[in-house]
Structures are given as structure tokens and as C-alpha cells.
Amino acid sequence: MALNAIVLAAFAPAHTEPGVIDMYLFLNLLSLAIAAAGLAYAVNAFKQIMAKDAGDDLMQKIAKSVQDGAKAFLYAEYKWLAVFVAVVFVLLMVGTDNPANGQYLGYRTAIAFLLGCGASATAGYFGMHCATRAAVRTTQAAKTSLGGALDVAFKSGTVMGMTVVSMGLVGITLLFLLYGAPDQNKDAVNYINYVLGFSFGASSIALFARVGGGIFTKAADVGGDLVGKVEAGIPEDDPRNPATIADNVGDNVGDVAGMGADLFESYVGAIISTAIIGFSLVPGGLTGKDHEEALTSLLMYPVVLAAVGVVAS
């Protein structure tokens, strides 16, 4: 009981009814626990993939080249993205408060933006990290069993998928817990604007990761074809052609890390946009506890639905 009182005092606005707070906390903590279980599942699937045979020395050498190239590209991309994120973070901190018009975005929106950027980048990196290691193990498994190769490849995709949805759900529920249950005071007007920062952060990373990775992929593909096949007469995808490695690096950073960030942005955007629609559907005639219950129920509906989706997956 004492712990519950501390949690209520920490996360709930003073104007919110106790019953509404209990429901809000329960649904958020439940969704957070489900998201954590999804991340644990992704980590376990990754460990199962890493336990598979990685093939002979030549296979591992080629795979290592792709892994190092993908890691180097993401490191360079994220380094420049960090500058962009820092600039936008500062602008959100100092440039969006307007007390005269009842707008209080500032540091809360900036924190949500930073969390969205971090979650999106993490999901993309972890998915790419798994994919570059699963590819060689899928090839080795295909030497003995088609079903074994499918199992490794499918598990690799599962890691990316579960990481994306779980990271998105973790970020949103943490923000909801951090900012507390909405009530009828002025915070209710700006509440969803705070959380919009999370979607903005996810979209920012997705934009650069998807487009940047795609450009790199196409440049390596065209360059490898022109120089390798046309000029040197080396067959396509031959490991003797350095552009083949670059092409495979591009496939991973664009179609895995970039696509993962893109899917993360779409997933988070769908949840938050549904919550915004829910805010607009609250009947205007409701007051007091009835208004807060309707507000909280419609806000939490997309979050709980997403949590059910994680369980179903």
C-alpha cells in the first residue's frame, strides 16, 4: 500500500480522481511489462541464432566484412544525426513555450523527442546487428536443411519485428507514466503535444536512416554492376568485387536498419495519432470524474491494443 501511494503521488496530477489514476497506472504498467517481455523474447531469439553454426572460415570472413561495413556506415550516419538531434532538442527546449497562449511544450516535448530518436536508432541498430550475423548462419543451415535455413531467417526477422514494437511501446508507456494521467486543467490541452515529440523523434531518425541507407545501397549496386560486370567481367555478387561487399552492406543499412526505423515511426505514429483522435472524441458535456475516465480510456485504448498485438505475435 505504501509503494502504491508513492507511485500515485509521483505520476498523477493533483486534480485527477483516484479511480482514474489507478486505471491509468495499471494499464500503463501492464503494457510496459508486456513490452519488456517482447524485448526479452527478441534477445532470446537472437541468442538462439548466434548459437547456430556460422560456417567455414571463408564464409565467416565475408560475413565479417559485411558486418564491419554496416557498423561503420551506421556509426558515421548516427554521428551526424546526433548533431541534428542536439540542435532540434535545444530548439524545442527554448523555442516552444508560449504561456500567454496557454502552450507549454518546451522541455517535456524535447525529452519525448530525444527518447523517440534514441528508441528508433536502437531498434534499427539491433535489427541490423542481428541480420548481418543471421545471414551467414542461414547460408550454412541451407547446406543441410531447407527448413533449418528458414528457421534461422524467420527468427532473424522476428528479432527485428519484436524489437520495433516493444521499443515503441516501452517509449510511449514511459512517457505516459512520466507525464501522468490527463485531467481537466490546462495540462490536458497540451498533454498530447508532449507525447507528439516522441513521434517527431522517431520520424526524424526514420527519414535519414531510410533515405541515407537507400542512397548508399543504390550507389553500391550501380557501381558494382558497372565496374564489376561491364568493365572487369566479374560475375554479379562475386566476393572478388569489393562493390559486392558494399552492396550487401547497403542492403543491411537500408533494408534492415532503415526499414526498421521506418516501421518504428509508422507504428509509433499510428498509436499516437489514434490517441489524438481519442482526445477529440471525448463528449463535451462530461465533467469531473466522468470526463477524466473518458479521456483516459480513449487515450489508453491504442496503447492496450498494441500491447495485445505484442502478446498475439
Model regions: which residues?
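Hydrophobic packing and interface segments
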Residues: 3-313
